[in-house]
């Protein structure tokens, strides 16, 4: 589903779906499907899979995820005009995937899921993997980023197929992409602020 979500918008724009079907709101349908795949499905997994969360916290945590995610999806600027996600972009399926693969403890899972619920309200600009125009103007870097995204998908799929064994190469590639994604997101959020502040100080 992550792969489909990564390419469906690009394919729709490629074939000009909005022009062919002007009365169909593809963005609305995309949000409905995304909420089901990224929020409801992982919450259901947390509810039915033993050992993911302490028994007393399963319902409160899954409720917090669904409510904060609903808030995120309802924001008219959840996707910014320059094609970034504002706040943690509800990657709950990816989060739960890693918790399952690495068999993290229930306490760690509870803390991380609670933290990510809070991060929804923190206006960090997270990279939109299929919309890179405002991340870089370099065509080479855009192609490289798409290749990295594809490699991430392959490595994560291999981790799932080989579970419970964990291959160091696939782990490194998968987590390396996550690290790069977070770095680019925080860099793109805070570097312009620091740059503007330095420029303003120099003018003074």
What spans do the regions from the language model cover?
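Structural signature of hydrophobic alpha-helical transmembrane segments
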Residues: 1-3, 53-66, 107-114
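Cytosolic, membrane-interface loops and tails of multi-pass inner-membrane proteins
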Residues: 7-24, 83-86, 131-132, 202-204
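Multi-pass membrane catalytic core of lipid/isoprenoid biosynthesis enzymes
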Residues: 14-72
């Amino acid at each position: 589903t992550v792969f489909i979500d990564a390419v469906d918008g690009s394919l729709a724009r490629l074939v000009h779906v909005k022009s062919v079907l002007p009365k169909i709101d593809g963005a609305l349908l995309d949000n409905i499907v995304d909420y089901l795949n990224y929020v409801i499905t992982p919450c259901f997994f947390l509810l039915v899979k033993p050992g993911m969360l302490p028994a007393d916290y399963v319902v409160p945590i899954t409720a917090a995820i669904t409510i904060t995610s609903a808030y995120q999806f309802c924001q008219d600027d959840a996707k910014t005009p320059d094609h970034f996600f504002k706040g943690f972009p509800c990657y709950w399926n990816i989060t739960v995937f890693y918790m399952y693969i690495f068999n993290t403890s229930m306490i760690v899972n509870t803390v991380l899921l609670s933290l990510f619920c809070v991060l929804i309200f923190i206006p960090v600009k997270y990279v939109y993997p299929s919309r890179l125009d405002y991340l870089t103007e370099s065509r080479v870097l855009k192609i490289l980023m798409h290749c990295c995204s594809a490699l991430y998908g392959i490595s994560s799929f291999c981790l799932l197929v080989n579970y419970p064994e964990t291959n160091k190469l696939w782990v490194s590639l998968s987590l390396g992409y996550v690290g790069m994604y977070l770095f680019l997101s925080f860099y793109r959020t805070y570097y312009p602020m620091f740059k503007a502040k330095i420029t303003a100080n120099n003018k003074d």
